[in-house]
């Protein structure tokens, strides 16, 4: 305790204490987490925020090592921070953190008060320690120190950055070189002697500018010398006195301080720029004095800001004289006469010991006692009490969704809500067969009691290539995981996420949090055939893990299951993670895709689900909820981070919490008091009154218990009656629209609320179908409203809008979020830039085309959009891909005009390579000067202006005149007023500033070249010269030029000719070759007297020449007088080895070493000819540059780009930095667009950062357009109903057994008998073709007015029996086999009788051969007693296969089929082929077949002779009716194009003949036929040579460009039309002895087998893959406009076939098979990572390779050979 007779003296050192720094910081961290450490905690938080703000503004290469910065104390563990360019700055920051933090901790742990006055304390220190001392001295109380301490930390960083940059301009540090000393202390010499030696050294070495050595500190027996490290070493070598004295290098690594010749008021003004605000400008009253290290009087300051300012000025420009500071402190002690002096320091040190000794001598009456402010760190008594953490609000900055009812984006979702849609429907066929899996009575085992749900359309759609997944992996990966990936990307895209752009987007600090409560796809779909990706594709943990892996997030990934509240509970986890600092950004959401009937069965039998349809939330007849798909993703950040990052904020999560209804009557029953407690907790945390919440999105499932309980809890808190609400409380539930998304329900509700806030309207509630639930309280009295129409909810200027999202779980958990509307942002100011770059990119050509198309449509619809915002969004706030287009313009219309030509050319647009091109910098010379160089950049780009200002200060420090007028345009337009020193300094300084600007933007050279004056800037760029030395040499040379050379006595002439040509023309005339810029571009120098004669002679010989407007003839004899003096000057400059190669035009060579470039070389730069083309050719020969190198010209005008273009191969890219007569912004916008299109990884953030506060992120731009295919494993059969393992095919002898559900369909009615043996299973079934379902199927295919069985009916029966028999053979299998119905032969047509009063029966016999895996099928006519009328009228064989193998087999022929479809389309466009509408097609078809509506799937047909294609859309489920395995009307719709060609086309004569099919060779569907989906059919019918009147062809069925079905060898036979009555009449009306059972004989075909395919069989595609080599097949050119004569599968690429070895072919086939990728897509450039060959698939491939080639292959082979080409080369070399 200090009394009146005590004085406290605080000393703040300039160096880190000798302790283990990391240990000290760890102890500070521990203290900050204690209950008593709240002040230290506040300091750390404020210091962290200050540092983050400063680090954000650093260039990327300086910023990257310091991010992410979660806590300022983490800087102590930055790797190798002492070796980096900011070593000095970081040391200053760490020193301030330790000294201020330890001071706070000391006073937190002791009873001594932190309160000082001018009479009780004084402060002093040295170096950066003075900043910490200033913060302490200016703090009236300990509570004020965190704010002022954070300011000191910020100042330390800014000053360190300034000192480092200024010092680097004086002498550049070599990359990766150890830190060098900028100061040395000399003992035993007085200050005058040392100064005399330094002056002598500086003068003798021409070192009189910024790099001169100087005295920075003086003491009684020592002097400190500061200066560039190389000069310091040199002076101790050449000065005898200094060399003889005792001296030591000081650990000063950050650069030069205490240097008045380097710094001025502009520097400290910049340092103090952010130190503003009331706290820094309050008057200080009776504060303790602060003594500098150079004076005996304290700093004079009345505010904290002034005190900091004085300290900064002293550190930059004041000299250290510590003895004077000690005298001042002792004098103060003498004035106050304390009896005790308590001296505080950070560890004992010699300085404190000396100061105490001096005080004891002069004040013997005063007792001195020292205290160690770090002493507390030695005690292990840290209070480990609870930490008080301040909650942070969480901003939602991005969102995306896939919701039922076609709501595949936010706009569609809002439209659905606005329209009040209820999108529930019957379970679609792509999930499971709703008929067989639903029994509303509940009697059938494992069936659902409800057929209803809400479903996402085509959830299998996915862009596998975008996410580097093979089709095989994509197929096996749960669609929840896949849609999570796509929605995560869309949400991140909307959030403007770019990896590592800011502190909060650093990949190390991003986590994913998703809720998921079921694994339907893994259990019901992928589980049918367990494969390589069954685990990573289906297990829940892989959903968020896959997102982390793809985006390279290193933060946590969590998959959470809390049943119905999973997504909202997981979002709360994400908020907690953000608030605790575990992450800086989070991607969160919920996932639910329903494919497993078990969930429906269990929930409906548990009385959760409605049997009558959708969720009737709030309705009196609410009877349960309706299950729903749902995928939602959101992006979260801390609010301050989001605002700092310039994000668009959709809403703010003020508070989130979860509790449990532990007191409920059962685990599934909600509990109102528990829910109410949760709401109150959240409101208390947020500090919001419940009466201020205007909208609540309730859980609202539509259950009686749930709705009434939730309404009770809501009204009890938010509308209790007393006090009465002044504004209505609106409530609603999205489940009435889109169902209950279960694990995704919470994120569904949250996204709805965010849209409500954005659209400023509450959509109507559609859950009340009859009347309000009577169990609810009187809502009108409570002022609670359920919106029956849309209600406006606009922003208010006086109050904020709040909404609550409520979610509870069937397992008892309750989760709620309180949402606040986003903050209002002021209107942005106009952007000063005159032109902008806009970019569009994608990972595939298809996506690029669609992205471009949607982007242009957006621009067309938004003519008033800000071009600045558009540029910012599409460049700085987008992840860019290899397929890219960037354009520039000054208006929106010009941008559209630039983009539109790319749209038709996308297919030929080449992607940029994965490896960026090399960059070469070319610095142009003095011939390009004009006034106003870089004027717009200087006026409006802060970073560029700062660089020019600092370079200008260097010029002034060298004694050179100001060159600013040349930039601001105050000189005459042609620059004639400017002296050479002005023009030369301007060019070199602008070039250096441009070089730094390009490097800040990520454009860094691998080689540099400079022409004439440009070589000085080039040497700076290569690290040979510092900026100061480059400026010094240029300025001194210009001065010598003015002093020793007479202007306008010599001239220069640019000539378009070779040196040899001019030598012949000017033989004997006086001239010199000054520049050889190209083979036919040279410059001559001569006297003015001779220039006219030279020009005339040259022009007379037909060569073009131009006289240059320059006052001196450089690189000529005119330069000779200045060479000697200039070399003498240059010897005083430090030359270093280049960091990158230098193309030297003065040598015509390339320089790598540190000896070539010296003072003599600089004279050569002035005198020798510029041999630019020689230097360039040498660089090409050394492979320093090549045709792909991008040349960036740096200088006032792009004068050398033409020379580069002429010397390099055609197409070489040249980029301008500035252009005469063009706005700087236009030049840069164009150049950055060019660089981006060339694949250069630009740092767009840095380009927009100076203007970002006035830029806005456009969140309504079209989302990425995916290149999707439907990856879907269809659940087949009904094995989910029979999981007990018992076969339903028990042996039986009864003629009519109860038919199993799996066998009963609309076409199979009764089980006659079933026999099961060891290797054989037989089943006989019976069907009545007059049964309503069967007859309806036949009656939809009417011929000659009769109901005739289409062969598709027989196909469906075949599929049904084959699938049933497979389950009998494999009773324990969960696999759904692929079935090929082969060799279908129909001998007799089947026509229904007119008399339907009695049955008309057929029986079908199926015999399964277990050993061969085949099922033989035969159809028989029987009478009513079951007796056969005759032998079989149809036969077929069913063979079991593999869906994926079929797709792989068909893949090689896909492009051929598609190309033929395209040809037909083009023929139709030009009128050569016929394009027929749906009505026209079936009108023509009607001359033979009258199809019912559900059979009429062909929507359009293009017909050309016997070749045709059709667009097909299958009938909707409500039209279909019945129960089918593969519905006959679906089969017929995709296949009967073949029959239409013959019976409705113009290739044959359908008036005389008709054509019917007796069968086909094979019928396979690799994907289920799905209603509503668009398919394409293609077939070319060909006559069979061997059999007159027969035609055959292959019908290809395609979906989204992929062959998904193939009916191979479908055959038709010709019959005279006169026989149609004979063949197609009802059997009971026939008079010529027709069969009583209803068969109709086909003439001459019952006694023999018909050919069922053309000469080529569809197995040829499989042969292509299996043979692997030696094939010789014909591939049609898709550009051929004539119909093909044959359709054959594609071969392997012709080049490969001719040059590759058989082993390569086999390897490629294996890879194609395992990845499910077409062989044609496996180019040499294909990276294995891009086609999904990960560690798992590598193991599989290695195993397959080993088995195939009988060699030992390791999975690491695909790491060693990352591309297909690499693998091919390896196989050729080693196999």
From Swiss-Prot:
GO terms for molecular function: fatty acid synthase activity. Keywords: Multifunctional enzyme, Phosphopantetheine, Phosphoprotein, Transferase. This is Atrochrysone carboxylic acid synthase. It comes from Aspergillus fumigatus (strain ATCC MYA-4609 / CBS 101355 / FGSC A1100 / Af293). Its EC number is 2.3.1.-. Gene3D superfamilies: 3.30.70.3290, 3.40.47.10, ACP-like (1.10.1200.10), Malonyl-Coenzyme A Acyl Carrier Protein, domain 2 (3.40.366.10), Polyketide synthase dehydratase (3.10.129.110). Residues 921-1241 are annotated as: Malonyl-CoA:ACP transacylase (MAT) domain. Residues 1677-1689 have a biased composition (Low complexity). Multidomain protein; including a starter unit:ACP transacylase (SAT) that selects the starter unit; a ketosynthase (KS) that catalyzes repeated decarboxylative condensation to elongate the polyketide backbone; a malonyl-CoA:ACP transacylase (MAT) that selects and transfers the extender unit malonyl-CoA; a product template (PT) domain that controls the immediate cyclization regioselectivity of the reactive polyketide backbone; and an acyl-carrier protein (ACP) that serves as the tether of the growing and completed polyketide via its phosphopantetheinyl arm. Endocrocin is specifically produced in conidia. SUPFAM superfamilies: ACP-like, FabD/lysophospholipase-like, Probable ACP-binding domain of malonyl-CoA ACP transacylase, Thiolase-like. It comes from the Eukaryota. It holds the Pfam family SAT. Residues 1698-1775 form the Carrier domain. GO terms for biological process: endocrocin biosynthetic process; fatty acid biosynthetic process; secondary metabolic process; secondary metabolite biosynthetic process. Residues 1472-1621 are annotated as: C-terminal hotdog fold. PROSITE patterns: CARRIER (PS50075), KS3_2 (PS52004), PKS_MFAS_DH (PS52019). Non-reducing polyketide synthase; part of the gene cluster that mediates the biosynthesis of endocrocin, a simple anthraquinone interesting for many biotechnological applications. The pathway begins with the synthesis of atrochrysone thioester by the polyketide synthase (PKS) encA. The atrochrysone carboxyl ACP thioesterase encB then breaks the thioester bond and releases the atrochrysone carboxylic acid from encA. The atrochrysone carboxylic acid is then converted to endocrocin anthrone which is further oxidized into endocrocin by the anthrone oxygenase encC. Endocrocin and related anthraquinones compounds have interesting activities for medicinal uses, including anti-inflammatory activity. Residues 391-821 form the Ketosynthase family 3 (KS3) domain.
